[in-house]
Amino acid sequence: MARSTARKRALNTLYEADEKSQDILSLLDERIAHPGAQTPLPDYAIEIVKGVAEHRRQIDMTLDEHSTGWKVRRMGVVDRNILRIAAWEILFTDDVPDKVAIDEALALAKTLCDDDSPAFIHGLLSAVCTAKNAAPAPESVAEEADEESSDSAAAASEPTDEGDVSDSPDSSGASDEPAAPSAEIQPTVD
């Protein structure tokens, strides 16, 4: 229950920053220093707000990429920030299972959004999860590239039977093999 409350408090902060067109981290600093009538923000709410602020551009690009018919900037403010919280948990945290992130987003949407929002949010977050699970993790792409580079270097240093080095890779590092797929999200063009 504590994390559910933290998500709601993080949503309130993100919503307020979005509505006021205020810098998220500046507003967060204000809320931490002067919580007002509310209890201080839970640590997990602070972590969410900082995480969304740090990764907002990538989160929004990912949501835009997987959204059908709606760009993030056109979504309702509450919907948009519920999606940002869940996308941050899905893409950037390891301690929250994807299903939990989706279920928590749906719980917020059912109480705070219109009747169509939960289905839209569920579909969009499911697409984000599917894409995340289909793509190699950034660490594994880097490890594969390191292994390929080590294999190429080892093969280049091995002498051939005839002493011919024409089959070794050239010194420019060019290779006939395709490059490993990029794990970065590419922006979409409207």
From Swiss-Prot:
GO MF term list: RNA binding
Disordered: region residues: 135-190
Domain of life of the organism encoding this protein: Bacteria
Stretches with biased composition (Acidic residues): 141-150
Record has Transcription regulation as a keyword: yes
Gene Ontology terms: cellular component: cytosol
Keywords: RNA-binding, Transcription, Transcription antitermination, Transcription regulation
GO biological process: DNA-templated transcription termination; transcription antitermination
InterPro entries documented for this protein: NusB-like_sf (IPR035926), NusB_fam (IPR011605), NusB_RsmB_TIM44 (IPR006027)
Known role: Involved in transcription antitermination. Required for transcription of ribosomal RNA (rRNA) genes. Binds specifically to the boxA antiterminator sequence of the ribosomal RNA (rrn) operons.
PANTHER family documented for this protein: ANTITERMINATION NUSB DOMAIN-CONTAINING PROTEIN, N UTILIZATION SUBSTANCE PROTEIN B-RELATED
Family to which the UniProt record says this protein belongs: Belongs to the NusB family.
Protein's UniProt name: Transcription antitermination protein NusB
Gene name per UniProt: nusB
